[in-house]
Amino acid sequence: MTKRNIVDLPEDLVMEILARVPTVTLVRLQSTSKRWNVLIEDKRFAEQHFTNAPRHSLLIMLMTFRVYLVSVDLHTIHNNKVNIISQLRLKDPLSNFLEEVDICNVFHCDGFLLCTTVDNRLVVSNPCSRDTKWIQPRNFYKKFDIFALGKSSCNKYKIMRMDQFYPDRPEFMNYEIYDFNSNSWRVVGKITDWFIPRCMDRGMSVNGNTYWLASTNKDLTSSSFLLGFDFSTERFVRVSLPGDHLSDPVFALAVTREDPKICVAIIQELHIDVWIATTIESTGAASWSKFLSVELANLYERICLDSWMNFLVDQKNKVLVYRDGNYWISNVFLHVVGEDKCIQVDHHDSVSRCSLVVNYVPTLVHI
């Protein structure tokens, strides 16, 4: 029987094979064949690949205003280092020299990244397909705007922006929606009875919707609640939190890495309890399951956890992954913490600091 090279196979069969190859591997293969490159750039193939390819979670890290795609070993205790796979290079369209823009925040949904720049601009990018779309404002963006990237039940992607119009009254805000189909903004409503503290303004995206910790007053411990935004109805809903809250704990939000679910860490003086939302109804009713409890006294290093901490939950390995919060120069970038483990993950560059870590599932789908 004659052996056949994959490039000689019928196109339908090649599509079927490549649609099951992990995204990052497929991107590396693009340069090996012009035929494959054309195929991988095709929107029909991207949709087929999104449905069939295995989902391998990586991390997005924001370091010194640059966005990196990285992988992390959750098991190695000694000499564990961040493995940088690639860098997202966003060229400034307003610069004659195509300088890179400085990124100050990143939001993630379905492999797309919504980035805010230091000079208050907004851009959506897919690091794998290399698509980039600059989002023009209805009027202008402001430093303390709150953004979220999501999608409706019919898979229409949208951006939600909260605009604080009284600087000294954070509970008074307009909110508006950018629709990718119409490429335009429209004002949807006003907010007057709650606010999202600036230290918690980066929401968590799960199944197309976004969640924050919000408050009805400035006493964040006694009045915090979970707030969700439904991109289908374009409305906010309060979601019930787990626990009895009798001791005024500090809350922090996270997302599971594998099958995305919203998580809440309840931070007490001596321990941390992590809960996973198994279901969230449109009414805000939620069912929670306790995932992990970590006794801080059992760890060899005291860990500083706050309501503005940025962390992820890995269900398979039963650990938390969070960025180092120290303000002094250090090689330590991440901590991996479980019931019986505490691992430090280093980076070779001790000058850089990680200001954000986001779970990322690569996709070839175009913006």
UniProtKB/Swiss-Prot annotation:
Q: Which NCBIfam families match?
A: F_box_assoc_1
Against Pfam families, the record matches this protein to: F-box, FBA_1
- What is the scientific name of the source organism? Arabidopsis thaliana
> What residue stretches are annotated with the F-box domain?
3-53
This chain's protein is named: Putative F-box protein At4g10190
